[in-house]
């Protein structure tokens, strides 16, 4: 049975207590995921992991040596080392699907003004490594980004989702956003469920949902809409 291993290195390991809940926690208990958390300070001298930046500037920069020690201890030749970073490649549906086939991912969650750039050069000469961005904004650290990346790709691991068909109509599956969904009651505070969803005609329902996907995507993500139209016409 395929068991993916993910290691998270951080100076705030408490961030990852959430790995015991929801689908990820269930997958962990069922033996589908092997998740391990490491405190970066354990790989440093006297717990010191940062220093002032060369050239001046605000804040502190994380030293390369503790990260190198952690990576040497945790990673193997099969590992992919991921640095969550605003300067990394954008996270996407396709990238999430690709990550789900990895045997071992090591997430290096930086803080402060970032990590000494030499750690990226050093890692790239020894292991497969990648910077990944979850959006055009800056967070206080890489922990939340690492969790977002994890949430995105574990859905593709067989057995994690209760209903595998959920992936078939997933938002972004065909460069389209998700259609609106409804549940009981049929009338809520004067607002009604669209009649077509109550018709039982699955062909019409499928057509309606696709139309709504097109409308929503064109309105809020015209870039995805253009890609979908191009791929459909190709």
Curated annotation (Swiss-Prot):
InterPro entries: Alpha/beta_knot_MTases (IPR029028), tRNA_m1G_MeTrfase_C_sf (IPR023148), tRNA_m1G_MeTrfase_TrmD (IPR002649), tRNA_m1G_MTases_N (IPR029026), tRNA_MeTrfase_TRMD/TRM10 (IPR016009). CDD domains: TrmD-like. It catalyses: guanosine(37) in tRNA + S-adenosyl-L-methionine = N(1)-methylguanosine(37) in tRNA + S-adenosyl-L-homocysteine + H(+). S-adenosyl-L-methionine binds at residues 110, 134-139. Signal peptide: none annotated. It comes from the Bacteria. The keyword tRNA processing applies. Its main location: cytoplasm. Keywords: Cytoplasm, Methyltransferase, S-adenosyl-L-methionine, Transferase, tRNA processing. One of its GO terms (biological process) is tRNA N1-guanine methylation. It is an enzyme of class 2 (transferase). It is found in: Cytoplasm. Homodimer. Belongs to the RNA methyltransferase TrmD family. This is tRNA (guanine-N(1)-)-methyltransferase. It comes from Tropheryma whipplei (strain TW08/27) (Whipple's bacillus).
């Amino acid at each position: 049975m395929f068991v993916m291993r993910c290691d998270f290195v951080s100076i705030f390991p408490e961030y990852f207590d959430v790995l015991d809940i929801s689908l990820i926690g269930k997958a962990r208990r069922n033996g589908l995921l092997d998740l391990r958390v490491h405190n970066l300070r354990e790989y440093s001298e006297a717990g010191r992991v940062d220093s002032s930046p060369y050239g001046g500037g605000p804040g502190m920069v994380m030293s390369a040596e503790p990260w190198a020690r952690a990576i040497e201890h945790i990673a193997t030749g099969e590992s992919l080392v991921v640095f969550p970073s605003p300067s990394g490649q954008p996270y996407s549906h396709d990238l999430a699907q690709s990550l789900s086939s990895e045997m071992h991912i090591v997430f290096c969650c930086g803080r402060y003004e970032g990590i000494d750039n030499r750690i990226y050069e050093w890692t790239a000469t020894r292991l497969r490594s990648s910077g990944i961005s979850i959006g055009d904004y800056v967070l206080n650290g890489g922990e939340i980004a690492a969790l977002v990346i994890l949430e995105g790709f574990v859905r593709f691991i067989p057995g994690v989702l209760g209903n595998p068909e959920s992936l078939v109509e997933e938002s972004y599956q065909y460069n389209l956003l998700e259609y609106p969904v409804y549940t009981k009651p049929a009338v809520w505070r004067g607002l009604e469920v669209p009649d077509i969803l109550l018709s039982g005609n699955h062909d019409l329902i499928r057509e309606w949902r696709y139309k709504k996907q097109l409308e929503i995507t064109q309105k809020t993500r015209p870039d995805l809409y253009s890609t979908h139209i191009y791929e459909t016409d190709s």
